[in-house]
A protein has these predicted regions:
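Mid-domain alpha/beta scaffold segments of enzyme catalytic cores
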Residues: 22-23, 28-153, 157-160, 165, ...
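Active-site-proximal beta-strand/loop segments in catalytic clefts of secreted hydrolases
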Residues: 39-42, 89-91, 115-117, 144-147, ...
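Active-site environment of divalent metal-dependent phosphoester hydrolases
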Residues: 44-46, 93-96, 119, 148-150, ...
Length: 318
């Protein structure tokens, strides 16, 4: 959910704004401690001052003072939870540089992605620069692509050369889908945002133009359940992550949505993502959200926590 984070905080920092249930305050450690790949993390420029708004779920003032402190706190939380790999994209400022800084700080743990949008205030990166970074392996994912916040879908011609590049280099794409903060389209940052543009079905033309493209539908496509199921059913190269919905939604709603994705047999295509934004402790809340789903077998949890992402990102295991 890579948007104007400060505006996100203004819009829905209070738990009531999203119908959330505060109070999940205890530090969480999964038991047994399964290896985890978090496919949805965000980085901020090292010298960027971060807001002090409490975590909207547990009420804790857990935001580090700047991007560098945020990096260190997130890496510590990843180590504590046995998050062996994390896919990170920039959330503000120079997004490519922010992700690269994380990779340089923990090259064995971090996979850097190219956070891109395509709006007037956040233009797409120069294609040649992106090609060089992807070809060299310094960036390994095209995403998070926040087309919805630019008033576009992934099938818009603006993204065509970038998708062609990803297909050519066999680089996976991670697309923001689903929802955004309440009232976001009224804010100057995101006047072109439309809820309807979060519909995962809008990727269909792009997928047919690029049949070899691997695509992660981020945020589980919530609340577009039927459309997400349709894309997973018709396009075997499509996976989905649970970022943000596994800690910001009420637990009962998240579990119901996850169960609905599991019932048609997509347990091998769902990946753990957190979308921690400013709050390092959100990583643990998100992991707990998936781990506490009692309808999941231990094998299904291993797939969601690690195996599916290892396969999607071609990490050599899973």
């Amino acid at each position: 959910m890579a948007i104007d984070r400060r505006r996100f905080l203004q819009l829905c920092a209070g738990a009531g704004a999203l119908g959330l249930t505060p109070g999940r305050a205890a530090a969480y450690t999964p038991s047994p401690k399964l290896p985890i790949i978090d496919v949805h993390l965000h980085a901020y420029p090292a010298d960027e001052a971060l807001p002090t708004t409490p975590n909207p779920i547990n009420g804790k003032s857990s935001v580090p003072k700047d991007g560098e402190g945020h990096l260190r706190a997130c890496l510590a939380e990843m180590k504590r939870l046995n998050v062996v790999k994390g896919v990170v994209s920039g959330g503000s400022g120079d997004r490519l540089a922010a992700a690269a800084h994380w990779r340089e700080a923990a090259p064995d743990r971090i996979i850097a992605g190219a956070g891109v949008r395509g709006s007037e205030d956040t233009p797409l990166p120069e294609l040649g620069v992106l090609r060089n970074e992807l070809a060299a392996g310094r960036l390994r994912v095209l995403g998070e692509v926040t087309a919805q916040y630019a008033g576009l879908s992934l099938s818009d011609p603006k993204y065509e050369p970038y998708l062609a590049l990803a297909e050519e280099l066999d680089v996976p794409v991670a697309l923001h889908t689903g929802t955004g903060p309440p009232g976001i389209s009224f804010d100057p940052c995101c006047r072109h945002f439309r809820a309807s543009l979060g519909n995962p079905a809008l990727v269909e033309e792009a997928l047919n133009r690029h049949p070899k493209l691997r695509l992660n539908i981020m945020h589980g496509g919530w609340p577009y359940l039927e459309e997400t199921i349709s894309m997973l059913f018709h396009y075997p190269q499509v996976y989905t992550d649970l970022g943000a919905i596994d800690w910001l939604l009420p637990r009962a709603e998240f579990h119901a949505y996850l169960a609905a994705l599991m019932r048609p047999g997509f347990g091998k295509r769902i990946m753990l993502g957190t979308d921690q934004m400013f709050w390092p402790d959100a990583i643990g809340i998100a992991v707990e959200g998936a781990d506490s789903a009692r309808f999941l077998t231990s094998s299904e949890k291993r797939d969601i926590f690690h195996g599916n992402a290892a396969r999607f990102f071609r990490l050599g295991t899973g």
